[in-house]
Design a protein with these regions (language model features):
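A composition-biased, non-transmembrane "mature-region" signal
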Residues: 1-168
Length: 168
């Protein structure tokens, strides 16, 4: 059962539409979870979350959420016309004390700026988390497409879009 999601501060995104291809999102999510388990990523948690397709009364879409500390991936797989698309969004979702601080007008951002340290280690582990999940997603997509005789994605097609990771 999926739960209502909280929005993360997104800093990386990837998507790809595969024409003339159909698959099961639930099977894709289960295969990604298995691929991640084999990688033994520390502090990893998975769940299903619901995101609305539009406004308040719109339908909900189930995503696979992969969380490690304050970093979250929301992964989607869904039909689109005669094709099927895959996408993921990677962001930061503050928890605990910093979640409370982040909602304080004016002072919250100042406290984060001066008291919350962004280190090389945090940047490195964020990139390793992204790379591990990206590799798992690509592995599963390659397995699914090759099973149906569809060419594998190129390296360029697998490349994520990074935003502001180093400006944190």
């Amino acid at each position: 059962m999926a739960r209502k999601a909280r929005m993360a501060d997104i800093f990386s995104h990837w998507y790809h539409l595969i024409e003339n291809f159909q698959a099961s999102a639930k099977e894709f999510y289960a295969a990604v979870e298995a691929a991640l388990q084999r990688r033994q990523i520390p502090d990893l948690k998975t769940s299903r979350v619901d995101w609305r397709e539009g406004g308040l009364l719109s339908a909900k879409r189930e995503y696979l959420r992969i969380k490690r500390k304050e970093l979250v991936f929301d992964i989607s797989a869904a039909p689109f016309g005669t094709g099927f698309f895959f996408s993921w969004w990677l962001g930061e979702l503050p928890s605990g004390f910093w979640a409370l601080v982040s909602i304080i007008p004016f002072f919250g951002p100042l406290m984060e700026l001066f008291l919350r340290r962004h280190t090389y280690y945090k940047a490195d582990t964020a990139l390793m988390f992204q790379e591990s999940v990206r590799a798992a997603v690509n592995e599963v997509i390659d397995q699914m497409t090759s099973a149906k005789g569809i060419r594998a994605l190129t390296d360029l097609e697998k490349k994520p879009i990074l935003r502001e990771l180093y400006r944190r």
